Amino acid sequence: MDKFQSYLGLDRSHYFLYPLIFQEYIYVLAHDHGLNGSVLLENAGYDNKSSLLIVKRLIIRMYQQNHLILSVNDSKQTPFLGHNKNFYSQVMSEVSSTIMEIPLSLRLISSLERKGVVKSDNLRSIHSIFSFLEDNFSHLNYVLDILIPYPAHMEILVQALRYWIKDASSLHLLRFFLHECHNWDSLITSNSKKAGSSFSKRNHRLFFFLYTSYVCEYESGFLFLRNQSSHLRSTSSGSLIERIYFYGKIEYLAEVFAGAFQANLWLFKDSFMHYVRYQGKSILASKGTFILMNKWKYYFVNFWKSYFYLWSQPGRIYINQLSNHSLDFLGYRSSVRLKPSMVRGQMLENTFLIDNAIKKFDSIVPIMPLVGSLAKSKFCNALGHPIGKAVWADLSDSDIIERFGRIYRNLSHYHSGSSKKKSLYRVKYILRLSCARTLARKHKSTVRAFLKRFGSRLLEEFFTEEEQVFSLTFPRVSSISRRLSRRRIWYLDIVCINDLANHE
């Protein structure tokens, strides 16, 4: 961020970001931050040097002529510097999204410094959500499963940025990219799975940036109403640019909501309410009654309709009772279960037993969706029978073993919060045998022969970090090591969901 500050000179430029698109170092920064896996280097037949040459030629052409003004009706294969225009539109859209993120990231850092937050990495962790649920959900009664609607028009997303980015030229350039992107209409859907798949295609960073800005707008309004209707101040543990303006827009929102909701605030007073968002969905849990949750449900519908021109069906927001409902998200199945316990009491000379049920938060890994993810990645068939990874057969033996071992260690690390580890044992079996079949296919041998040859080595590769730590800490007490390895462990260094664990 120090480099960003020196490059931008924000105090002097007043957030005029448009000229930065003509600077070569911005393209380098976009590449270094891993935008879309680096579209410059993913293009077939280009290395680092030729990619930089493409950037230089692109900037020179933009200086000489206005090549940004291209007719939407032109052919997709219209040559532009020897390539089709979609390729360069994609490159420039990614760079533009990087440019617009820079001042927001700088503001986030200054905001954290003002609040005295020294390190925010733990707040970004996915596992911090589950540790939060473990501490709070056992005391709640109802939960709202909310499917966040998507804007019907991209202009709504652009307008959400007007309060963040003051450079009109950058916003006009953003509109140009949205019209150029041929898959932009795939976002016009209320199906989060379809919208999520569109993010993984072209212009991932740009659409994700626009979507998070829209979500920030809607959540800032919800946060304002939440703070006004509760005696307790809510604290935000969101991540990255989604947290930047939660508090900065309160002053503006006060004018908007004062007349519309002030008379109805008493309907929503609830001191025990928690909100979690993930992958285009959100959860609103409360200790209140069913009537209160139903009021919140229709508040969301009317709020989206009035201020974002979004039509959302009330049927897309489900009210469930936590005692008999499971939450499937982020690769876990979470629920609140009643754990029976018996207490022996004594009064004078009489003893009696008291049945007592305690609410306990539980999280497990659903095995069938996980096996389905492995089947899509060609590690096994639909029934869970391991198959060889044919595309890896050209790699060396050590690379094949290392890849399979790393996949399992990552999955085991991500699912360490599961209370039941049996599903991970099945994943370990599938990946281990798939590795053996891949090696056997490469050397035209049998699986049995390779298991005899590499048996101990294959087993070592599939040891997780936790198992190694426990075995080193308690080398002589195997029972303690096994008992500790079965407990739920939440890691605060996981900031992105594993692709195989993502069943949404």
Swiss-Prot record:
One Gene Ontology cellular component annotation held by this UniProt entry: chloroplast
Main location: plastid
GO molecular function per UniProt: RNA binding
Keywords: Chloroplast, mRNA processing, Plastid, RNA-binding, tRNA processing
Task performed by this protein: Usually encoded in the trnK tRNA gene intron. Probably assists in splicing its own and other chloroplast group II introns.
Similarity remark: Belongs to the intron maturase 2 family. MatK subfamily.
HAMAP family: MatK
Protein name as catalogued: Maturase K
Gene label: matK
